[in-house]
């Protein structure tokens, strides 16, 4: 079995998102990413909010590297911009 870690939801919790990744990492089969303002679940393009992307990349590489990733944004344009950031930052 496994779990889906919604990283944007984790970023809104009282527990640091990298702690979620560390504790659940061996069970994480799938990850949802998008950005937010650390207050509300906005489904912004990756890079348009306040989530620390480098912490995500490091956590993914260390704890969840075999998990699939879904860019879960509110529009096609936000997905396109997210992929541009992910490519520019070397994640994909």
What are these regions (language model features)?
Residues 1-5, 10-92:
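Histidine-acidic metal/acid-base catalytic patches
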């Amino acid at each position: 079995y496994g779990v889906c870690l919604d990283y944007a939801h984790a970023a809104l919790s009282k527990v640091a998102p990298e702690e979620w990744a560390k504790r659940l990492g061996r069970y994480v089969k799938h990850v949802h990413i998008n950005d937010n303002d650390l207050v509300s679940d906005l489904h912004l393009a990756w890079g348009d909010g306040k989530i620390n992307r480098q912490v995500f990349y490091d956590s993914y590489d260390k704890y969840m590297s075999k998990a699939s990733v879904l860019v879960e944004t509110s529009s096609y344009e936000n997905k396109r911009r997210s992929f541009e950031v992910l490519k520019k930052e070397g994640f994909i």
